[in-house]
Amino acid sequence: MTLTDGRIVDRDEGNHQWEGHQINSGIDWDIWNQKDGFKDETHQLFKKPVVMDAFCSVVRVLDLDRVFVLGGNKNMDSTNPDTQTATMIYNVKDRKFELSTKLNDKRWYGSVVRTGDEKMIMMGGQDYVSSVNSIIPEILDLKNFNKGWSYLNKAKSEDLFGDTNNTLNEWHYPRAFLASDGNVVGISYNKIWVMDSRDD
């Protein structure tokens, strides 16, 4: 794979390529119009459209016009800012990137689920710099971004979003799904759980 600065990187080369190289950052965006095939002109490259490192973030399509990018990264090998609490909206129609409401906790390798009443819950992840796990999920009303993110304090769990015995990494991309009864069902490593939507 050839990077935008001309460097060539091999796929699946392991730790020797991970440690210390400069591509642990997701700061450039390539928007591809797949309807027009695989030609170079079907891609539009945006170099640093906003100050957000989206490496290890989560991306969700909100509607036909907006894509939501949540959580970010702090590349320890660069001078890039710490954007682990950042969120961003990509406007498909206008092809514009705009920073959105910040998360309360750092969510490197976090996960999200969208509820039936148009809310987004983010859970898991950690602060990459300090290795402090984000054990309290937080919620955003997608109909009212201005209210910002709120903690779901009753859902706080070291067991489900921490790192039991420093071996299981439950914080690492816990999987979550919206069940037919409106509750959130999740998997944290080898643990299955349910979040009651009727109780904050």
Question: What do these predicted ranges mean?
Answer:
Residues 1-200:
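Kelch-like beta-propeller repeat domains
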